[in-house]
A protein has these predicted regions:
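Phosphate/diphosphate-binding glycine-rich loops and adjacent basic-rich segments that engage nucleotide
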Residues: 16, 21-34
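Short, mixed-charge, low-aromatic patches
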Residues: 13-22, 126-133
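Short, small-residue-biased leader/transition segments that mark boundaries at the very start
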Residues: 3-5
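Hydrophobic alpha-helical scaffolding
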Residues: 8-13, 46-54, 63, 159, ...
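Predominant activation on well-ordered alpha-helical scaffold segments within soluble catalytic domains
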Residues: 17-20, 58-65, 121-123, 163-179
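Short acidic (Asp/Glu) and glycine-rich catalytic loops that position anionic groups and cofactors
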Residues: 1, 38-44, 148-154
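Glycine-rich anion/phosphate-binding loop at the beta-strand->alpha-helix junction
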Residues: 29-145
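Internal helix-turn-beta structural module
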Residues: 131-197
Length: 197
């Protein structure tokens, strides 16, 4: 319902109403819909990730792509960057209270495979639920063409259910990289054990 969509997944009353109406149309048509989940990570320390083999963006994308219904991942401006130019896509740096800061965040908080201290922005494209009540073409085990109709109750969209899955995969990946980063430097290991007293 519209209230469930608004309260749990979509803070905008206007878009929650539009989403509820759209999903009702899909249900009446015995069809389904995909969608996009946006995940933001605030407070990430600078320098998490590696410049080549354990790039933060590659690790996050790999983790999120391993979720069954995910068909695409973008970081920052993602595919919009392909139509941009360097002068517009680069994130200008400046000093704020004695620390580096960025005017924009087209990179989505990751530069050169490592976190840059700004908000990490990730989007996951979720495919439409394949189990729909419309008749669909298929083939048998023997290769004969046929049709199939799936009966039962099916969700018109799984995007809301996948939000917590995306959050969990991102959190596990971030934790793994934080532990890896901590143990990669001898000073960090020494400080960790000395601070336990």
């Amino acid at each position: 319902s519209e209230m469930c969509i608004r309260d749990r997944y979509m803070p905008s009353n206007i878009y929650a109403a539009k989403a509820a109406s759209y999903l009702e149309q899909r249900m009446k048509a015995c069809d389904s819909s995909g969608g996009i989940i946006e995940c933001r990570i605030d407070g990430m320390p600078v320098g998490i990730g590696e410049p080549v083999f354990h790039k933060l963006d590659a690790m996050l994308a790999g983790a999120v792509m391993s979720i069954g219904a995910v068909k695409g991942v973008e970081i920052g401006d993602g595919f919009l960057a392909a139509g941009s130019c360097g002068s517009k896509n680069n994130d200008p740096f400046y000093m704020k209270d004695g620390k580096p800061a960025k005017e924009t965040n087209h990179s989505g908080g990751i530069l050169g495979g490592m976190s840059d201290g700004s908000t990490i922005l990730l989007r996951a494209a979720i495919k439409p639920t394949p189990s729909i009540a419309q008749e669909q073409k298929t083939i048998t085990r023997d290769g004969d063409e046929t049709t199939i109709t799936i009966h039962g109750r099916h969700d018109p969209v799984i995007v809301p259910r996948a939000v917590v899955v995306v959050e969990s995969m991102v959190a596990i990946t971030i934790l793994d990289l934080l532990i890896h980063n901590m143990s990669a430097k001898l000073d960090n290991i020494r400080d960790f054990y000395l601070s336990r007293d």
